[in-house]
A protein has these predicted regions:
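Canonical Radical SAM [4Fe-4S] cluster-binding loop centered on the CxxxCxxC motif
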Residues: 78-115, 122
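Short Fe-S-cluster ligation motifs
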Residues: 121-135
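Internal gly/pro-rich beta-alpha loop/helix module
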Residues: 140, 153
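Conserved, mostly hydrophobic/aromatic
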Residues: 167
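Conserved small/polar residues in nucleotide/adenosyl-binding loops
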Residues: 171-177
């Protein structure tokens, strides 16, 4: 296996069930996944903390503090049938769109797959749509984004349906010059 048992136990939200079972065995992986996804999350398994929540009638903005004291935001949009969560994939953003606050301080780092998944876990809400469009440019963190989607879709964990996951990316346009 390419991971150690300590890596799996220290950051379990960063691994699919298959990866876990290859490293720590099927029985322990099954028990750990049950603890992670079928019960309320326990602080010992989380690498980020909720620092602030701003609520309005139909939206909630969460500010999370990461282990390296950096901050990211996640937005939950309430709907009659559950909710949509807008998830960050980076700390800061390298694109610098003029309409976006995230890029004003520049790019700091990519989020790990675990940090992406934990944004959804920490909401403790019924989420039926995930949009990767919070802080950062999702496709600039492609490997961790794809791994997070695999973890979210894992049938032993959240078993999130594919049709409820969307990414939003910028399009680079070259405008004609005069």
């Amino acid at each position: 296996p390419k991971y150690t048992p300590a890596e799996v136990r220290n950051d379990p939200y960063g691994f699919t069930y298959k990866e876990m079972s290859e490293v720590i065995g099927e029985n322990e992986a099954k028990a750990l996944y049950e603890e992670l996804y079928k019960q309320l999350p326990r602080k010992k398994n989380l690498s980020m903390l909720v620092k602030n929540i701003c609520k309005s009638s139909d939206t909630e903005k969460y500010v999370y503090e990461l282990k390296d004291n950096k901050y990211i935001e996640t937005v939950f949009i309430k709907r009659r049938d559950g909710g949509t969560v807008c998830v960050s994939t980076q700390v800061g953003c390298p694109v610098g769109c003029i309409f976006c606050e995230s890029g004003r301080n520049g790019f700091v780092r990519n989020l790990t797959s675990s940090e992406i998944v934990q944004q959804i876990i920490l909401l403790r809400r019924k989420v039926n749509r995930i949009v990767f469009m919070g802080m950062g440019e999702p496709l600039f963190n492609y490997d961790n984004l794809i791994k997070a989607i695999h973890i979210l879709r894992d049938r032993y964990g959240l078993n999130f349906p594919t049709d409820g996951i969307t990414t939003v990316s910028y399009t680079h346009l070259t405008l004609p010059t005069k």
